[in-house]
Design a protein with these regions (language model features):
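Short glycine/proline- and charge-enriched loop/turn segments
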Residues: 33-36, 90-96, 230-234, 352, ...
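Histidine-centered metal-chelating micro-motifs
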Residues: 162, 183-185, 207-210, 298-299
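Short helix-loop capping/hinge motifs at secondary-structure junctions, enriched
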Residues: 190-196, 232, 259, 284, ...
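Conserved N-terminal helical subregion
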Residues: 1-6, 23-25, 48-187, 232-250, ...
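Flavin-binding catalytic cores
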Residues: 237-271, 343
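Conserved mid-domain beta->alpha element of the FAD-binding
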Residues: 6-36, 155-156, 184, 247-249, ...
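Active-site substrate-recognition segment that forms the wall
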Residues: 198-234, 253
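Conserved SAM-binding loop
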Residues: 330-393
Length: 393
């Protein structure tokens, strides 16, 4: 296999998964990550359908199951804490509880994937790609912390706001499809005493209310908030610092009741606070020359699809497999990768568009009344989830 020097930008989910497979196939893999180390925090994410088989082939399926959230159900409350709805059949974050899906915290899944890669993979934390120049035989890369190196292939696995994608394909405004909202997440103590349980608080206005779920054997909880806004990220978030973003959330939630005031107090000291746009990435092509995209950087489905993580893991498997099948011929491999996966990625993006349209219609018809069926994922969800079968490479 030729073209074995591969640089991957991003060390969250798609990056470590791709690194695992490329290392297994004999590549010299380097992963560069802007953060100083594995990033803590993030929402609970779901591993479904063929992504479960990817985990099984990596030998980590049982381990991720040991880290699953293990929620027993969910309830909804009003501003006074009165229960409006309760179920032990499903949750808003993870869907049907009797499914084979694995709901796991983003940072837990990332840790498992990073560990699976072993010592053969080089990780460069606290750094990122400053520039790259493609030549006929290699890509010359310079890093923000200094120094330059040559690689045969560069893969952007650095998410919706991929700086690597911007260097090669142009600014994200060309590719970002705004879904009309922003999602915030942070960790708090489980002071509510939730026992593998999820609670949703809904409120009227331009916010989605709040959600709290106990995690890690009830030792802590994750808080979710949502803001309705069509403002592009460059305007709503722009150059705002994390402290500025927290002030934005506090201002939007100034009239919130139930436990939201206390949860917002915890937000101020939360080191893992994260606020970002709910968006999709639509690309006419996933590759240009010796550079290609994987996961959210190329085909993010948004949190509204419930499938971004799974599609990213499948994408990593397919990209590595097609490189192996092509003997390292990046031109042939990138074309085969996109042929193989684009239909699945687009179908999963459509899930999010359908879910948003359905929820918008329900909100319009419901008015200010609380949603008492907040976790219905719609017909055909699992048909799409399971519509792709992994190839053997």
């Amino acid at each position: 296999m030729r073209n074995t020097r591969v640089l991957i930008s991003g060390a969250s989910i798609a990056g470590p998964a791709l690194a695992y497979w490329l290392d297994r196939y004999g590549c010299q893999v380097t992963v560069v990550e802007r953060a100083a180390g594995p990033r803590p925090g993030g929402q609970a994410i779901d591993v479904r359908g063929p992504a479960l088989e990817v985990c099984a082939r990596m030998g980590v399926l049982e381990e991720i199951r040991t880290h699953r959230t293990g929620l027993r159900g969910m309830s909804m409350v009003d501003g006074d804490g009165k229960e409006l709805f309760s179920t032990t059949e499903r949750t808003a974050s993870g869907g049907q509880l009797d499914s084979p899906d694995v709901e796991i915290l983003r940072d837990d899944l990332s840790s498992v994937l990073l560990a699976a890669g072993g010592d053969g993979i080089e990780y460069l934390f606290n750094d990122s790609i400053a520039s790259l120049a493609q030549g006929p035989d290699e890509v010359a890369v310079t890093f923000h912390r200094g120094g330059s190196r040559a690689f045969d292939i560069v893969v952007a696995a650095d998410g919706v706001h991929s700086s690597t994608r911007a260097l090669v394909f142009g600014p994200e405004e060309k590719f970002l499809h705004h879904m009309g909202g922003y999602l915030g997440v942070w960790t708090v103590p489980n002071y509510l005493g939730l026992d593998r349980w999820e609670v949703i608080y809904q409120m009227p206005g331009d916010v989605w209310g709040g959600m709290v779920m106990s995690v890690r054997e009830n030792t802590e909880a994750r808080v979710y908030i949502g803001i309705d806004s069509d403002e592009p990220p460059a305007e709503l978030l722009g150059s705002r610092t994390v402290s500025d973003q927290k002030r934005l959330v506090a201002e939007r939630y100034r009239d919130a009741r139930w436990e939201m005031p206390r949860l917002l107090e915890y937000m101020w000291g939360a080191p893992d606070f994260h606020l970002d746009v709910a968006a999709q990435i639509h690309m006419d092509s996933w590759s240009r020359g010796r550079v290609t995209l994987v996961g959210d950087a190329g085909y993010c489905g948004s949190p509204m699809s419930g499938q971004s993580t799974s599609v990213a893991m499948v994408g990593a498997y397919v990209l590595a497999g097609e490189l192996k099948a092509a003997g390292g011929d990046h031109t042939a491999a990138f074309a085969a990768y996109e042929r193989e996966l684009r239909g699945y990625a687009v179908a999963n993006q459509q899930l999010a568009l359908d879910n948003k349209a359905r929820k918008d219609a329900e909100t319009t018809s419901r008015g200010q009344e609380p949603d008492t069926n907040p976790t219905d994922i719609g017909d055909g969800f699992y048909e799409v989830v399971n519509s792709y079968t992994l190839k053997d490479y």
